[in-house]
A protein has these predicted regions:
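Contiguous beta-strand/loop segments that form the cofactor/metal-binding neighborhood of enzyme cores
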Residues: 62-142, 175-184, 204-205, 220
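N-terminal binding-site loop/beta-alpha segment at the start of enzyme catalytic domains
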Residues: 220-288
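C-terminal glycine/acidic-rich active-site capping loop/insertion
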Residues: 126-194, 209, 214-216
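Predominantly a Rossmann-like dinucleotide-binding segment in NAD(P)-dependent oxidoreductases
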Residues: 3-78
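Calmodulin-binding IQ motif helices
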Residues: 291
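C-terminal helix-rich "cap/oligomerization" subdomain common to oxidoreductases
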Residues: 104, 179-236
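Alpha-helical elements of Rossmann-like donor-binding domains used by nucleotide-donor carbohydrate transfer enzymes
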Residues: 7, 11-15, 26, 62-63, ...
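Short histidine/acidic/glycine/proline-rich micro-motifs that form metal-
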Residues: 2-6, 87-90, 256-258, 282-285
Length: 291
C-alpha cells in the first residue's frame, strides 16, 4: 500500500505510540465512493474480483491491523473476531459493507467500504482523553499539492500537524520497492509478507461473511484444477514397520488452511509430489480444519 511509506502515516503511528499506551482504543476508518458503472465493469463483476471490499476495503482493514500492531509493539496485529454487515449488488459483489473488528480487550475497530456511496474516507483513532483525526489517509495530500495534516485533540486542546510532501505518494512507494530490489531484500519493512498474507486472509473472511461467492473460490469451478502443471512424484518414501504402504518422509501439517479451496489446492499438490501422510490433529486452527 502506497500510504505505508508516506510521512503522514509514519507521524500517525508515532502519535499513536505516544498517546494510546495502556488505554482502550477505538479505530474508525473508511474508504468508499459512488461508481455508477455498468454491470460488466470490473467493480461489479464477480469474475474480475469486483466489489468494495477487495477494491478499497483493503485499505481501512490494513490500516486497522497496522495501528493495532503498533500499539502492541508489533508490525501488525490480526483481529480475534469480525462481525460484518453489508449489501450485495445484483451481480453478486458487495456494494457496501462494514466490519467490527476486535483485536484485544482494549483495541477494536469499525471499518467501512463502498462502491455505491461516498464515505468520509478518513481515519480516527480515539480513547477517552485523546482523538487523532487523519483526513485523506489513503491519498496523503496527493490532490492538495502534497499538503497533508493530522489533527490531535488532547485535554481540550486542538493541534494541527501539517506539512508538505515534496516527493509524492506513489513515488515514495516506487522508491521503497526499488531500494528493496537494489539491496536484495525480498520484502519491505513497510509491509512484510506475513502482514500481506494476513490482510488477504481477513479480507476473505470479510467478503465471505458478507455473502460474496467468487467463482474462483468454489472448488468445482476453480481454474487451479485445470492447470497444465504436471508434478513429479519426487518426495522420498520409507517403509514403516507394521504398515504395508510406504509413507512419505515429509508430513503435511493441516494447521493453517483457511478454506476448502485452500486446503484442496495444497493437499493436491503435496499428494501429486509423492506425499501421503497428513497431520490432522483436532486442535489445529481451533478445530476449524474438521468442520
Amino acid at each position: 500500500f502506497m500510504y505505508r511509506t508516506h510521512p503522514q502515516t509514519l507521524e500517525t503511528l508515532k502519535l499513536c505510540k505516544e498517546y494510546f499506551k495502556d488505554t482502550d482504543v477505538k479505530i474508525l476508518s473508511s474508504f468508499g465512493f459512488d461508481a455508477p458503472v455498468d454491470k460488466s465493469h470490473r467493480l461489479r463483476n464477480l469474475n474480475l474480483a469486483g466489489g468494495a471490499i477487495l477494491d478499497v476495503g483493503c485499505y481501512p482493514l490494513s490500516m486497522a491491523r497496522l495501528i493495532a500492531g503498533t500499539l502492541n509493539d508489533q508490525q501488525y496485529l490480526d483481529p480475534i473476531s469480525i462481525e460484518v454487515k453489508g449489501s450485495l449488488d445484483v451481480t453478486g459483489v458487495d456494494n457496501k459493507s462494514s466490519a467490527n473488528l476486535v483485536f484485544s480487550e482494549n483495541i477494536s475497530a469499525y471499518i467501512e467500504t463502498s462502491i455505491n456511496e461516498e464515505l468520509k474516507n478518513d481515519l480516527i483513532i480515539k480513547s477517552d482523553k485523546v482523538e487523532i483525526i487523519v483526513p485523506e489517509p489513503w491519498h496523503c495530500g496527493q490532490f492538495q499539492d502534497g499538503n497533508y495534516s493530522i489533527e490531535l485533540n488532547f485535554e481540550g486542546k486542538k493541534t494541527i500537524i501539517s506539512n508538505k510532501d515534496e516527493v509524492g505518494l506513489f513515488t515514495r512507494e516506487i522508491n521503497e520497492a526499488s531500494e528493496c530490489i537494489l539491496q536484495g531484500n525480498y520484502e519491505s519493512s513497510s509491509m512484510s509478507h506475513k502482514d500481506t498474507l494476513g490482510n488477504m486472509l481477513w479480507l476473505e473472511k470479510w467478503y465471505s461473511e458478507n455473502g460474496v461467492k467468487y467463482p474462483q473460490n468454489i472448488v468445482e469451478k476453480s481454474p487451479i484444477f485445470s492447470s497444465q502443471y504436471e508434478p513429479v512424484a519426487k518426495l522420498v518414501k520409507s517403509e514403516i514397520e507394521g504398515i504395508s504402504k510406504k509413507g512419505s518422509r515429509l508430513v503435511f501439517g493441516c494447521d493453517n488452511q483457511t478454506s476448502q479451496l485452500h486446503a484442496s489446492t495444497m493437499f493436491d499438490n503435496f499428494f501429486n509430489n509423492g506425499g501421503n501422510i497428513f497431520d490432522t490433529a483436532y486442535i489445529y486452527n481451533l478445530s476449524l480444519i474438521h468442520i
